A protein has these predicted regions:
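Conserved cytochrome P450 K-helix/beta-meander segment immediately N-terminal to the heme-binding cysteine loop
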Residues: 314, 331-357
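Cytochrome P450 catalytic-core helices
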Residues: 256-281, 377-395
Length: 425
């Protein structure tokens, strides 16, 4: 079957010009422009690979659920194993299914209710330490806070002394990651380039911290009911596998929430009416409005901004689109969530849109979907809402001078500092 022969799309050189020289950073703009010209399902090629992009909820459901067995994780996710190893985000079945069963109890609702006490305490402590009327980088602050919460709740450890080191190492590795997706990425991994050396040093730093944590907990021997206790008790997980799962949870367990909180602060600083309602809700205990704020933040800035799969056999989708074996298929919640026919006035920050009818299934997928849906979704939603309420009870935020842009890397993080000023209410 010729690759995607039923689909239109941009020519090879148009694609190259659009994505050169930094494909990942330019990918959202390329997708927006191509959707406008070719619609919500199209094919495109680069010299080394054929691609299909789907932006229809029903087809995304096929990709992630009804025809999931025709696909494996994409090349980008496989390259991500350099950072995370064979953790939940990167592994395939049966390993993924087995390890998900091991870790899943740590994310049950009763456990999250216990974690909420840590989230509330640490969120309130951060709010109390914040200096009013001084500009600060919201993303750096939220990264440090959420990393502390993740280590306390998921790993039963206070790694506050090394929180900055861990955050810096993760940031460096994720910044270097897109370069490894290029055709010369495999070669870059082996050359003694400065950026490559920095990547491997950062990984070594994280490995040292994680293996030390594993050793301490093995010596301790107690079952604390957290994710690390479950991994240590599993007969299926040696230290290497535990390291891979911890690395994945380190990244996903704080990065997702740090980004969500940063984008929430950024949006509320620009929408004072929403901010006032959210603050009033936080003070009165109205969790429903705060939940809608969080839901709307994740619509505009979904953590799983790009989803990639590779077909392992020829596939025909329900709309007749034909996908040849070996084709990379992308879906993008970042594009999907801004479709005007699904979300009227899609660029408007409007938490009350969630009072109306729910969008169609798989039209709103900030954490992905199907069997690979983010295991920590409920954890992230709870943490974002709890910390945001702690901040809103005391402060309103104003933007400080500086440009804010997205960095579409492993997650949808800011490209640089998000400078804001906290004003006492």
């Amino acid at each position: 079957m010729p690759a995607s022969n039923a689909l239109g799309g941009p020519g090879r050189w148009t694609t190259l010009r659009s994505l050169f020289p930094v494909p990942f950073r330019r990918f959202p703009a390329f997708l927006r422009a191509t959707i406008e010209r070719h619609g919500n399902v199209f094919a495109f090629k680069l010299p080394w690979r054929s691609y299909v992009f789907i932006n229809e909820p029903a087809l995304i459901k096929e990709l992630l659920v009804t025809q999931q067995h025709a696909f494996v994780k994409s090349l980008g996710t496989r390259v991500l194993r350099l950072l995370l190893g064979e953790g939940l985000l990167t592994s395939e079945d049966p390993l993924h299914r087995r390890m998900r069963r091991v870790v899943q109890p740590a994310f049950h609702r009763e456990r999250i209710a216990e974690y909420a006490r840590v989230m509330e305490r640490d969120g309130a402590d951060f709010a109390a330490r914040l200096h009013p009327d001084e500009a600060f980088d919201a993303h750096a602050a939220m990264t440090e806070l959420t990393l502390r919460i993740a280590t306390e709740t998921l790993f039963g450890s206070d790694e506050s002394d090394s929180a900055g080191t861990v955050a810096d190492a993760l940031r460096l590795m994720m910044t270097e990651f897109p370069a490894m997706l290029t055709p010369i990425g495999a070669l870059r991994q082996r050359l003694p380039l400065r950026n490559t050396r920095r990547f491997w040093r950062a990984r070594s730093t994280l490995d040292t911290i994680i293996y030390s944590l594993i050793a301490r907990r093995r010596r301790d021997g107690s079952d604390r009911g957290d994710a690390l206790s479950m991994l240590l008790a599993s007969e299926d997980a040696g230290d290497q596998q535990i390291r891979d799962e911890i690395m994945t949870l380190f990244m996903a367990g704080h990065e997702t929430t740090a980004n969500a909180l940063t984008w929430a602060i950024y949006l509320l600083a620009q929408h004072p009416q929403v901010d006032e309602r959210a603050a009033s809700a936080a003070r009165s205990g109205d969790r429903e409005y705060v939940a809608r704020v969080v839901k709307e933040v994740l619509r505009l800035y979904p953590p799983a901004w790009i989803i990639g799969r590779e077909s392992v056999r020829d596939v025909t989708l329900s709309d007749g689109s034909r996908i040849a074996s070996g084709t990379t298929v992308f879906a993008s919640p970042l594009m999907l969530h801004r479709r005007a026919d699904l979300f009227p006035e899609p660029d408007r920050f409007d938490p009350d849109r969630w009072l109306g009818p729910e969008p169609p299934p798989f039209a709103y997928v900030p954490f992905g979907g199907g069997a690979r849906r983010c295991i920590g979704e409920e954890f992230a939603l709870a943490e974002t809402a709890i910390v945001l309420q702690a901040l809103l009870r005391r402060y309103r935020f104003e933007r400080a001078p500086g440009r804010v842009e997205i960095a579409p890397l492993v997650t949808l993080r800011p490209a640089g500092p998000v400078r804001v000023i906290a004003r006492t209410r």
